[in-house]
UniProtKB/Swiss-Prot annotation:
The gene is tusA. The keyword S-adenosyl-L-methionine does not apply. Interacts with IscS. Pfam families: TusA (PF01206). Belongs to the sulfur carrier protein TusA family. This is Sulfur carrier protein TusA.
Length: 83
């Protein structure tokens, strides 16, 4: 089975940044993408574990995949698509 985290349109590296910077960078990057594009975000900030899913729900994006068992945390987000 293919790992969905290996297939994405855009990449956002927020390693070393702390709240609220990863979320602010995600918001800015998402604005430049079109509906249906995928964004892989990596972070080492533990606050992203709750912030990213909440952001996706609030902004109407779909958190397609998440790896949070070790750093870097990885989030695959489908822009403007609830599912």
């Amino acid at each position: 089975m293919k790992d969905p985290l290996n297939h994405y349109d855009h990449f956002l590296d927020t390693l070393g940044l702390r709240c609220p910077e990863p979320l602010m960078m995600l918001r800015k990057t998402a604005r430049d993408l079109t509906i249906g594009q995928t964004l892989l975000m990596i972070s080492d900030d533990p606050s992203t574990l709750s912030d990213i899913p909440a952001f996706c729900r609030f902004m109407g994006h779909h958190l397609s995949a998440k790896k949070a068992d070790r750093i870097p945390y990885q989030y695959l987000i489908v822009i403007g698509c609830l599912e």
